[in-house]
Amino acid sequence: MSCYLLSYFLLFMEVKFIQILKLTIDNNTLSEYEKYYFKQHPKARKKPIQNPYHPSINEWMVMKRPMMNALKQKYKDFIIWFIENQGYTNLHIKQCEMIFTTYYKTNRRHDVDNTTPKFILDGFAESGFIIDDDWKHLRQITLQCS
């Protein structure tokens, strides 16, 4: 069984210390979320999140506005659940740096700049995990593919 991972390393820069958190979204995380999701939406048949990594910017930028908003909402709901499940809701991180590492299921060529985690960052802000995803609070983003 292939394992797809999207890992986040977060460096929290408080007054005198740096704390590192590693958050991982994999197939097990998606399975847990699907159980929760289908309990909340018993008539739903389709998985809300297809892969444990953010959709490529090439996929969602060409969508019509309603489809893109629906995808964004699904990811926001998923990330809010994920952060709550990790126990980090309303952490309100003031400043941080993030490293996003995406492990794809194939060795097909991927452009690292297409992995922009916009929907995930919006979910982080909405859940209260970070204060906001603006430049004052999110000082640096590093994108990696493996």
Each predicted region: which residue ranges?
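Catalytic phosphate/metal-binding cores of nucleic-acid and nucleotide-processing enzymes, i.e., regions
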Residues: 2-146
